[in-house]
Amino acid sequence: MNNICKLNKFIISKSSSSLSSTSSKIKTNCLIKNAKMFSSSLNLNRFYSTNNTNNNKLKKPLSIGQATFETHPYLLDKNEITKGIKMKEFKDRREKLMKNFPIGSVVVIFTPPEPMMSYDIPWSFRQNTNFNYLTGFNEPEAVLVLVKTSELDHQSYLFVRERNEEKEKWDGARCGGENVKKYFGIDFGYNLTNRDIPILGKLLKSTTDGKLYCNTTPWNQLSNKLEPFLENIKFYTVESLLQQIRLIKSDAEIKMMLKSGEIAGTSFHETMKYTGTKSSSSSSSSSSSPLNEYQVSAYFEWCVKDKGAQRMSYPPVVAGGDNGHTLHYIQNNQLLNYCDLLLMDAGCEYWGYTSDITRTFPVSGKFTEAQSEVYQAVLDVNKKCIELCKPGETINSIHLKSVELIQAHLKRLGIINESNPNDYRLYYPHSIGHYLGMDTHDTLDFDYGVTLEPGMIITIEPGIYISKYDSNVPEKYRGISIRVEDDVVIPNLNNSPLVLTHLAPKEISEIESIMSNK
């Protein structure tokens, strides 16, 4: 099998035990040899001018394809690469990653080309999460290379699309290799051109142990050009190490997550008010059409973007009535029944950080007695499980407590009986929550048995879902599906959990007051 086939198969080894043993075998003369190679054959002393030499144009702030302090001073502080995250924090993240590797190791992080909706129509671009975490760079088709040069240091290289006046006229500004160091704090910047790709290839080949640590394989066009440099190179995943670093959030990240949660929470408040107003209007007028799920979905999306969010965290669930029985219902195209509940699971992404909230509220603005009984049961589980979000617990241990509480409520309501306690799974089929961060389902390599530590963020989302066709349930509860979800920061010992989504109303009295416009 040729090497490029090996690359495309990307045979992953998650063994980390070889790192320490490999480190002890690195010799000083190897470092000297590599240093000479870097300075000569790679020509790393090349640098680019950032000055505008076109005398025929008026001078203007340099646009690099994303917000900078120079072009967006109202968004970014002087030392920030992205909103809320300074250049130093990005450097610290790279340092944390490289501490896991022996001298001479090479880590390479790829971000793929822009995904296309059709032949020449692109999807809205979202940067690869790990690439964003390590660089803050927001263009497709880029390669980050990190080379461990000593026990305490590494060198960083960023290869990007070159600037192209004609293409930028159509698709917007690019950074170009010449601006990488200034704006992103990367040691060396290069363009992904035929001239510079051999430099990338030699960097990858320079690994002293014959291993490359990657997040994924390069895209096909780049892969073909790198093939001559990759003979006898083995590829290992760096995904778990990156996720381990991402699992615990910095103070700056928690602030960004709080902002994301507050934007989404406030938008839930406004969406409840909108739903109450529209539903009241349509119910009192024979000429008005009933509210549709897609109208509620669209209004929420407008609210979060109006407050500065870049996008939704995921396709929202806006499920009226029995649609709430489908956990990931995303068609959002059914008319809302005035007497039904509306289960809405939605969040936003604010500068790379996500929120994930579920609220359930009555289309009419007023809970029925049966709806209130089930809702209070779910809310009770939500609150008690939030109290358990402390160091030493696990998502699994909190889930077991949620099962115990759900079982008790379902028995009390007459939905399950003592002889079949495991029937709770029919009405509560999912886990209590998941890790949350830059991705909605964050750090997926880590199971729910990991001991929670300060700075981790998880969701707490108990639910009870009853089909309107379930004849085993008292009739008054049929068709009631309720979930209440919040985002919670694990605090330091002896402190209370921080609920990032505290602005999303969840008490019955508060919801009814908002929806009646009181």
Curated annotation (Swiss-Prot):
One of its GO terms (molecular function) is metalloaminopeptidase activity. Substrate binds at residues 314, 345, 356, 434, 441, 461, 485. The keyword Mitochondrion applies. InterPro entries: Aminopep_P_N, Creatin/AminoP/Spt16_N, Creatinase/aminopeptidase-like, Pept_M24, X-Pro_dipept-like. Residues 1-48 form a transit peptide. GO terms for biological process: proteolysis. Its cofactor is Mn(2+). Homodimer. Catalyzes the removal of a penultimate prolyl residue from the N-termini of peptides, such as Leu-Pro-Ala. Also shows low activity towards peptides with Ala or Ser at the P1 position. This is Xaa-Pro aminopeptidase 3. It comes from Dictyostelium discoideum (Social amoeba).
